[in-house]
Amino acid sequence: INGATGSAGQLAVQIARYLGAKKIIATGRNAQTLAALDADECIQLTADDKTLSGQFSATSAAQIDVVIDYLWGHSAEVLLPALAKYTPAGRPVRYVQVGSLAGADIALNGAVLRSAPLVLMGSGIGSLSMPHLLAATGEMLQAAVPGKFTIATTPRPLQEIAAAWPRDDSQKRTVFTLG
């Protein structure tokens, strides 16, 4: 999970664990948040490119099935070539691009896609049909209690919506309360 220290990434770690992922590898910049995650391995994105490439290469060699990327940007530019070069042959890696907190664009050599079974996918409004999106949302809502999913929230009265709406915080989600 690339970008596991934001609220969506932290939730993704919990969901992956609930769904039975054999090994969860989490990346992020905040060392304290990374350490608190229920991940099997953590990679701190504040390292230099050579160190990151080495860490991504080592994890890729251990067979990654799915990457959920909330960051895109520079970390994807370092991660994708490592996946292409070191992923064992025969099993594709699904790379799901969800967010772009680290940048909307990346530079990617076409050879990366030709040299390995990488499947790039997007997840967002439009990537799934409405019936599939509603079904998946329903499944996650049904799993929330037995999975004990939690996220950090900031409660705000509904009358403060105009002031609170533009304040985006990837660490906490704003929850509007009535009354």
At which residue positions do the language-model features occur?
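Short amphipathic alpha-helix with an adjacent loop that forms part of the alpha/beta core around
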Residues: 49-62
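N-terminal Rossmann-like NAD(P) cofactor-binding module of classical short-chain dehydrogenase/reductase
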Residues: 65-68, 96
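Local beta-strand N-terminus motif with an aromatic residue
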Residues: 39, 63-64, 92
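Terminal peptide-recognition signature
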Residues: 16, 67, 79, 120, ...
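Short acidic-hydrophobic, aromatic-tinged amphipathic segments that line or gate anion-handling sites
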Residues: 41-51, 152-160
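C-terminal hydrophobic helical "lid"/dimerization subdomain
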Residues: 131-179
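Mid-domain Rossmann-like dinucleotide-binding core that forms the NAD(H)/NADP(H) cofactor-binding site
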Residues: 1-48
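Glycine-rich phosphate-binding loop and adjacent beta-alpha segment
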Residues: 74-148
